[in-house]
From Swiss-Prot:
GO terms for molecular function: uroporphyrinogen decarboxylase activity. It is found in: Cytoplasm. The keyword Protein biosynthesis does not apply. Signal peptide: none annotated. The record marks D90 as: Transition state stabilizer. It holds the Pfam family URO-D. GO terms for biological process: protoporphyrinogen IX biosynthetic process from glutamate. This is Uroporphyrinogen decarboxylase. The lineage of its organism: Bacteria, Pseudomonadati, Pseudomonadota, Gammaproteobacteria, Moraxellales. The keyword Lyase applies. Keywords: Cytoplasm, Decarboxylase, Lyase, Porphyrin biosynthesis. The gene is hemE. Pathway: Porphyrin-containing compound metabolism; protoporphyrin-IX biosynthesis; coproporphyrinogen-III from 5-aminolevulinate: step 4/4. It comes from Psychrobacter cryohalolentis (strain ATCC BAA-1226 / DSM 17306 / VKM B-2378 / K5). GO terms for cellular component: cytosol. It catalyses: uroporphyrinogen III + 4 H(+) = coproporphyrinogen III + 4 CO2.
Amino acid sequence: MSASDNNNSLEQKFAPLKNDRLLRALRFEPIDTTPVWMMRQAGRYLPEYKATRAEAGDFMSLCKDTARATEVTLQPLRRYDLDAAILFSDILTIPDAMGLGLYFEAGEGPKFKHPIRQQADLDRLPVLDVNDSLDYVMRAVTSIRTALNGQVPLFGFSGSPWTLATYMIEGGSSKDYRYTKGFLYSNPDFLHQLLDKLATSVIDYLDAQVVAGAQILQIFDSWGGALGHRQFIDFSHAYNKRIVAELKVRHPEIPVVLFTKGGGLWLDIQADSEADALGLDWTMPIDRARQVLTESQRQLTKHHKKLQSSKAIQGNLDPATLYGSPATIRAEVNAMLDSAYANGEKTGYVANLGHGITQWVNPDNAKVFIDAVHDYKI
């Protein structure tokens, strides 16, 4: 059975998709209005999310509870006219499954009890059977896809190898990546060994999410922007490119979005991948990004690189905009969409925030954002 036939057989398990606006935009097909969703759209800014999380007891218990993970995924779709759902989970599920002891401290974010600091730590990392150690994620994907009943497409996701490695080596979040960058410059082979293991796990993890029901995939390279130019190419992009290429072999019809926070400087580099779309944070104007990608595609084609004709863009409203008044939010959305369509394009764009929505946003302001996107005349 071909990969395409396999994907078709998977789709037969679920209700037909009713709103395919986002998928059409990613394929550069005509759309009636701009599709929109929000990173972290199921999260702490919603009172109903807080109530469900309190019932679960803690964050990871919520992630591992199929019914509650399904519930919080659906909550924003009951409030807002969103064009996609995204699996409720965490980017650190892979290192947690590798035995690093993930835990959360109030006000400090995720931490690991057993960070990777020496070769023995690295050698102990298991080769994951994602359908065993991360089966709760796959159960959630299937449950969510079934509950959506074809309303909108479902995103699956993973952290990038570089981003996962920073947490695993630092033992949590970091401002300076002291240990990770220390290995990068003093023992790069050690870091490459870790990134190689992680890339293999990310491929299998995202593959399993598609089999479970995910219709789109996003790779979150949240800390790729912390790297220098050459280091980004070698320690982040190379592994992201490998992941996307393998996913396209296994599931050629599944769109892949690659989001590198702080990666606007490297759009020309990221263009040399099989990703269908590139995510932008708020520091890069969308019209400029379109121009860079158009030129990059021209140069890559000139050098006989086998690529699709173009790449869609996703993003990129500053999440802090949602602290503003409704009038300010609408004005900023209109400016963002003016930029997105400035070069005459009428598709190939998905509206989103430039990073995740924060816990302090008024839920009513999120609705202003979403409605303003849909109200904009392309």
